[in-house]
Swiss-Prot record:
GO terms for biological process: camera-type eye development; cilium assembly; embryonic digit morphogenesis; in utero embryonic development; neuroepithelial cell differentiation; regulation of protein localization; smoothened signaling pathway; vasculature development. The keyword Protease does not apply. The keyword Lipid metabolism does not apply. It holds the Pfam family B9-C2. Residues 9-127 form the C2 B9-type domain. Component of the tectonic-like complex, a complex localized at the transition zone of primary cilia and acting as a barrier that prevents diffusion of transmembrane proteins between the cilia and plasma membranes. Required for ciliogenesis and sonic hedgehog/SHH signaling. One of its GO terms (cellular component) is cytosol. It comes from Homo sapiens. This is B9 domain-containing protein 1. GO terms for molecular function: hedgehog receptor activity. Its main location: cytoplasm.
Amino acid sequence: MATASPSVFLLMVNGQVESAQFPEYDDLYCKYCFVYGQDWAPTAGLEEGISQITSKSQDVRQALVWNFPIDVTFKSTNPYGWPQIVLSVYGPDVFGNDVVRGYGAVHVPFSPGRHKRTIPMFVPESTSKLQKFTSWFMGRRPEYTDPKVVAQGEGREVTRVRSQGFVTLLFNVVTKDMRKLGYDTGPSDTQGVLGPSPPQSFPQ
């Protein structure tokens, strides 16, 4: 009896939000969520998460290390709307209010295997000095009501932003049945099964 052809393929993603560089800020935490097309659906794992608060390392790097795990599996019938991960970094201002310190997004790598990505972050800016002062005084900085707009792009061209910091991500990507559906993402359809990356740690 012939084996039925698969009707969907799987994309399995694990890894971690490893660390960040924000020279001007300390005591930060990170939120992540995935954005994907209408033909995609999560089948296992978590689509979003929030990390612990971390402080800068005491060495010359002054890195903010989270090592916050990512683990999610998607199914789809076509690659359109390939998942992106959206990051939002928050921390206290001088008044102790939680304010956004950076947004960023990147596509999940298309090829199976282990990947490292460093994402430049940005924050929305007020359009006038008066608005800047008012938002600083009131403790309410400009931010997106839905961080997922960072991955979508509509209306971004009319938003004033400022570059600020970097976040480093580690991905382990595995695909299943993409080749059977006619999609070629690499030498082997199930490559990418690797052991976990060692966590980044501070030098002794």
